[in-house]
Swiss-Prot record:
Main localization category: mitochondrion
EC number annotated for this UniProt entry: 6.3.5.-
Gene that encodes the chain: PET112
Lineage start: Eukaryota, Fungi, Dikarya, Ascomycota, Saccharomycotina
Organism: Saccharomyces cerevisiae (strain ATCC 204508 / S288c)
Protein name: Glutamyl-tRNA(Gln) amidotransferase subunit B, mitochondrial
Additional information: Present with 1390 molecules/cell in log phase SD medium.
Alphabetic keyword roster: ATP-binding, Ligase, Mitochondrion, Nucleotide-binding, Protein biosynthesis, Transit peptide
Length: 541
């Protein structure tokens, strides 16, 4: 019986993961999120301990103070940097920052919570309201626009972390308090999500926002950002989903739980959906953790050791005046004239990933904009907006990643005015695109081989002369004919040529053109090769 039940569960999970849960109109999904975000302040929330909760190299219990381990007699001292970070996020979300907020004790007993309570903001949270706007244009959702409302934001302290080790006789629990008392912001959304795309887009946008504001790494994998899901179907009781370590787990858990509840409703077995419950995600299914009857009474009470947080209006307005331009606004500017970037390229300049050590989005965007301005001055009204985009975002970044050169280093030999000069050579067809790629890679490769110590600015004219990279304006017909015949002669397979001539495999023509470009070192343009190959092979399509 157990094997059969397990087989049914795995089969259902496989179907959900393969095809996606069918969100049917008659089973309306209502979903909200609770997101805990660790703040990357210098110190912890109520002590002077170094805030290094997500470090993978530090020894356990290394970043702790007497207060973090709840030594009797120690008292909390509020870290004002956490207040500043919370204010930045609240203003970015359009939330109403409360002039007065307070900390409350949330009582429960657990090994990694040595105080016996957690300091949070239950009665008077830091901010209320706000929203994140999603759109089809920027976020790939089905609706043209979708507003996800924010209920509140509150500041609280993180707990320690329990580690479990099995021995022959028992299971040993080890507690690491490096994470204890790390500042968190808990964001609670309204239950405004109605499908998976909206959830995925919201998490990605919120993650980028906290990185953009420099208040958190936003990494789900390290626990710097943790997401709980609340969902219900057809107004049945709310189910909370926990243990969701990454975006794919969040999405798959929602799909699975939706399908599980739909099956119960469709057969009339709704008794288990009448009361709220908490379920955990195992990686393949959701399992019951606790129900309403076993819900903990946290006995909230105002903390007697911490005064109210009083924020004067001029403090809030002062922080508002220092707020940076937000990612959506930046992307919309980049996608319009004069830049005219695609959404994909605009996101490269706006969305920051902590996994990329070669550059951050702000430095890259600044480099792009400065180069664009310099190139526009040189090229005047005839400037091509696509040149800076293609050569910086695609060719230049590709070379930096391949050679493992940080953007900050590469800027020393190719500052924006110099890169603009390089783009001018391409724009005026002094060199071809193929020659440009060779020239750019050569410059960066030499720089990398000098351990990024040779800071001499490249002399493009000398390099073009040295490697004979000048584009040929007047093509020697005989030279072009010989090059094309040599390329064709390399392909003795009649099928290759026949499929090309008949149009069965048109892509083969691009292959021949590429070989011709390489043989001419990019000096002869691609369209010259295309015309000559079609003439020689009598291609009619």
């Amino acid at each position: 019986m157990l094997r059969l039940a397990r087989f049914y569960s795995l089969a259902r999970t496989k179907a959900i993961h393969s095809h996606g849960a069918p969100f049917r109109p008659e089973y309306a999904l209502k979903c909200g999120l609770e997101i805990h975000t660790q703040l990357n302040t210098k110190n912890k929330l109520f002590s002077q301990s170094t805030n290094s909760a997500t470090s993978l190299v530090d020894a356990p219990n290394h970043h702790t103070s007497y207060y973090d381990i709840a030594l009797p007699g120690t008292q909390p001292v509020l870290n004002l940097e956490a207040i500043l970070f919370a204010m930045k996020l609240s203003l970015a979300l359009g939330s109403q920052v409360n002039s007065i907020s307070q900390f409350d004790r949330k009582h429960y007993f657990y090994g990694d919570q040595p105080q016996g309570y957690q300091l949070t903001q239950h009665y008077r949270p830091f901010a209320r309201g706000g929203k994140i706007n999603l759109s089809k244009e920027l976020d790939d959702i089905d609706e043209s626009a979708k507003e996800i409302g924010i209920l509140q934001l509150q500041i609280e302290q993180d707990t320690g972390k329990s580690h479990y080790t099995e021995t022959d006789k028992d299971v040993i629990t080890l507690v690491d308090l490096n994470r204890s008392n790390v500042p968190l912001i808990e964001l609670v959304t309204k239950p405004d999500f109605s499908d998976i795309k909206q959830v995925r887009a919201f998490i990605k946008k919120y993650q980028n926002l906290v990185r953009h504001l420099h208040i958190s790494s936003g990494d789900l994998e390290t626990g710097a950002m943790r997401v709980d899901v609340n969902l219900s179907i057809n107004e049945y009781a709310r189910v909370e989903l926990k243990n969701l370590p990454n975006t794919s787990s969040i999405i798959n858990a929602i799909k699975y739980e939706y399908q599980r509840q739909v099956e119960l409703i469709s057969v009339g077995d709704t008794s288990s959906l009448m009361e709220p419950e908490t379920r955990g995600w195992t990686g393949s299914s959701t399992v019951k953790l606790r129900s309403k009857e076993t819900t903990i009474d946290y006995r909230y009470m105002p903390d007697p050791e911490l005064p109210y947080i009083n924020l004067a209006p001029d403090v809030i307005s002062g922080v508002r005046g220092l707020m940076p331009q937000l990612p959506d606004d930046i992307m919309r500017i980049l996608m319009k004239k004069p830049y005219q970037l695609s959404l994909k390229d605009a996101k490269i300049l706006t969305y920051n990933s902590n996994q990329n050590d070669m550059y951050n989005h702000e430095a890259l965007r600044s480099y792009y904009l400065d180069t664009f301005r310099e190139f526009s001055k040189l090229a005047g009204e005839r400037s091509n907006a696509k040149l800076p985009t293609n050569w910086i975002i695609h060719e230049f970044l590709g070379d930096l990643n391949k050679l493992q050169i940080p953007l900050a280093k590469a800027k020393e030999i190719l500052p924006p005015p110099v890169f603009a000069q390089f783009l001018k050579l391409l724009h005026e067809e002094v060199i071809s695109a193929t020659s440009g790629k060779m020239l750019l890679f050569h410059i960066l490769e030499n720089f990398e081989q000098s351990n990024c110590q040779d800071l001499s600015i490249p002399d493009f004219s000398k390099l073009i002369e040295k490697f004979e990279l000048h584009a040929i304006n007047q093509v020697d017909p005989q030279e072009l004919m010989d090059l094309c015949n040599d390329v064709i002669a390399q392909h003795t397979d009649d099928t290759f040529i026949r499929n090309l001539v008949t149009g069965k495999k048109k892509s083969s023509l691009k292959f021949l053109i590429g070989q011709g470009m390489r043989r001419s070192q990019g000096r002869i343009k691609a369209n010259e090769f295309e015309k000559k190959f079609k003439e020689i092979l009598n291609i009619q399509w």
